[in-house]
């Protein structure tokens, strides 16, 4: 019985490691987010795509929420460099136009327009650039 339990735990951990192995890899997140397109359009998601869709929505919404927090605290002088504050503030520039669906769509669009950045840019920075392009926000210089 103990051997069976140990084997089940090992298999579960292996699956978790494989599912999260590439979260910092922009190409992986973009691929997951492409599978989310039907869900974002209000259509169903095939059973086999539910995990990647959940990973996309969870990852992107977590980053967007973190960016909003950073934007709210970035008014403190010297807290963040100006260019970084502009990208982060983009998340809250036009809240009426933003939803996780629009943020994910902007992320996919930016990735499609800049495929050369996918293998050299960390995912959070890629999302920041996508948001800055789609939802520009001007922050006065210090």
Where are these regions (language model features)?
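Sec-dependent signal peptide recognition
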Residues: 1-8
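Helix-rich interaction surfaces within compact, conserved domain-sized segments
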Residues: 100-111, 115, 127
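Short, structural beta-strand-to-alpha-helix junction motif
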Residues: 21-29, 99, 121-122, 126
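N-terminal signal peptide c-region/cleavage motif recognized by signal peptidases
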Residues: 14-19
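Amphipathic alpha-helical segments in well-ordered regions
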Residues: 62-66, 110, 130, 134
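C-terminal partner/receptor-binding element of secreted or periplasmic proteins
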Residues: 117-142
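Short N-proximal segments of mature Sec-exported proteins
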Residues: 26-105
């Amino acid at each position: 019985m103990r051997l069976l339990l140990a084997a089940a735990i090992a298999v579960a951990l292996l699956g978790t490691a494989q599912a999260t192995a590439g979260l910092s890899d922009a190409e992986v997140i973009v691929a997951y987010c492409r599978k989310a397109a039907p869900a974002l359009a209000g259509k169903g998601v095939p059973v086999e795509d539910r995990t990647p869709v959940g990973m996309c929505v969870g990852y992107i919404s977590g980053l967007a929420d973190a960016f909003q927090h950073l934007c709210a605290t970035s008014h403190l002088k010297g807290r963040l460099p100006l260019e970084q504050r502009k990208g982060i503030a983009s998340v809250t520039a036009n809240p009426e136009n933003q939803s996780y669906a629009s943020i994910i769509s902007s992320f996919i669009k930016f990735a499609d327009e800049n495929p050369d950045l996918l293998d050299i840019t960390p995912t959070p920075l890629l999302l920041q650039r996508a948001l800055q392009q789609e939802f520009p926000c001007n922050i006065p210089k210090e």
